[in-house]
A protein has these predicted regions:
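Active-site-adjacent structural elements that line small-molecule/cofactor binding pockets in enzymes
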Residues: 13-357
Length: 357
């Protein structure tokens, strides 16, 4: 049996030198908490306004992502719809491949499929299987979906699920579905560089964390003899835009406080944020909730973990992400004090300034 565990050697130094030339596109990353009709309204706007991609999450227990994605693909014409992300605990990897093939049939060439362990969520729900190995489970699911949607049988023997040797999809899509990983840790970034088509950075991100993630992705790609520039590094970038700079910046503070209190340590450590400012927010959230955290959240933390303000502020804030190696920013969650106005400003003023022509 082929083994990939031996690839976890000591970290390799890889230098990434990139010049800001613009992003491959600009997308929207939506909330899973809104009613489906609201989500589909934003998807329709993204399709109409020229965004390259819209990402649909499956966090917590609000909406199941697959039926929403199916309707999104059926009712749009040009925008790519991303599953961002599904996990191979709630769904068997073969079922994930079948769902990917079905979605690809609904929207040919417009599906990007994100998989991730969603470890915090799975454990919080008490759904972690006995002896669960999140990294192994994710890698095997990624390899399974990529092989089966390419019309091939598995080229490895899975250890986290069972499948008959030689099994293939009865009707694979016309072309393989690109599969990304919702990665956070060093090891997950590196195996993504080996086996996936890209990585989607989730929750809150920063320029420093993006640069670190690109380096780790390159390490994995190098091990597999792949070119990291052929992979897609995307990220949920906490974004708020509006005509009033102060209102737009204030609009991200509560959600930023929520995630600063919960996000994995590496996300904050690699960001270069003021540790005392982060500690103050965490203490306030622990005592009084997200609103209390937002009240003590400094402007410096907004600068590190969000792009927020006027359209010019957002354009300026996105530039360093491209220099750090981000290919596709996914404006995430807030959009602005007025959601619809924020989406319009992103399309009309921000996107033309930051996307490659």
């Amino acid at each position: 049996m082929e083994s990939w565990r031996s690839t976890f050697a000591a970290p390799v130094a890889v230098t990434i030198v990139r010049k800001m030339t613009g992003f491959r596109g600009l997308g929207l990353s939506l909330s899973n908490e809104d009613p489906v009709a609201d989500t589909l309204a934003v998807v329709a706007a993204a399709d109409r306004l020229g965004f390259e991609e819209v990402s649909l999450p499956e966090s917590r227990l609000f909406n199941s992502v697959m039926p929403v994605a199916a309707v999104a693909l059926h009712t749009t014409r040009r925008v790519t719809v991303r599953i961002g992300v599904a996990n191979p605990v709630f769904r068997d990897p073969v079922l994930l491949a079948l769902e990917a093939a079905t979605l690809a049939d609904i929207g040919p060439g417009r599906l990007r499929y994100g998989l991730g362990a969603a470890e915090w969520t799975v454990r919080r729900f008490g759904m972690a299987p006995p002896g669960w190995r999140p990294l192994t489970n994710t890698v095997e699911a990624v390899r399974t979906v990529r092989r089966l949607t390419a019309g091939e049988a598995l080229d490895f023997e899975p250890t986290t699920f069972t499948v008959a040797p030689g099994l293939r999809l009865d009707r694979p899509p016309a072309s393989p579905v690109p599969v990304d990983v919702g990665a956070v840790s060093r090891r997950m970034m590196e195996v993504s560089g080996q086996y996936a088509d890209g990585v989607q950075l989730g929750a809150i991100t920063s320029v420093g964390y993006t640069r670190w993630a690109r380096e780790r992705l390159a390490v994995g790609a190098q091990r597999a003899g792949r070119d990291v520039d052929e992979l897609l590094l995307s990220a949920n970038v906490l974004t708020s835009v509006g005509p009033d700079r102060t209102e737009a910046r204030n609009a991200v503070k509560e959600v930023l406080a929520y995630y600063l209190a919960r996000v994995e340590g590496v996300v904050v450590d690699e960001a270069g944020a003021d540790p005392e400012a982060v500690a103050a927010v965490r203490a306030a959230v622990a005592e009084g909730g997200e609103q209390a955290g937002a009240a003590v959240l400094s402007d410096s933390l907004v600068d590190v973990f969000a792009v927020a303000g006027t359209p010019d502020d957002v354009i300026e804030g996105l530039g360093p992400f491209a220099d750090a190696g981000l290919d596709l920013p996914l404006a995430w969650y807030t959009f602005g004090p007025d959601r619809d106005e924020g989406v319009r400003l992103l399309a009309e003023q921000v996107r033309p300034a930051v996307v490659q022509t």
